[in-house]
Amino acid sequence: GLPNVAKLFEATAQAELIHAAGHLKAPDKIQSTLDNLQDAIDGETHEFTEMYPPMLQEATTENHKARVMFGFAVAAEEVHAGLYKKALEAVREGKDLEVTDFYLCPVCGYIELGARPERCPICNTKGEKFVQYQA
């Protein structure tokens, strides 16, 4: 319907990736791993409870195709918050996460720890398409 507005969103999404990479390289302040994990939990929780739900609602109301991606984002961000919580618990115990393999769904952003899933539980993408990250 509105291709130029769509392009704006696409360009902004890429800009956000650039910003995120920049923040990782040069954080505004040096914090402990515990603080960084808590900030990550807070950020992910904000995204799946406050930021994406109104976008999802509006896209659904307008029957816009973006509703699918917003739905994926809500679900994936909740998973991310849970993973950061697991990491926070481990660090509080003086440990690292025990898993060494991480699998990222290239469609919705879901992350699976340990073993490649058969299919993504959020978007149903085949597990063979997941991107593996190893320590």
Model-derived regions, located:
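Non-heme di-metal
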Residues: 1-135
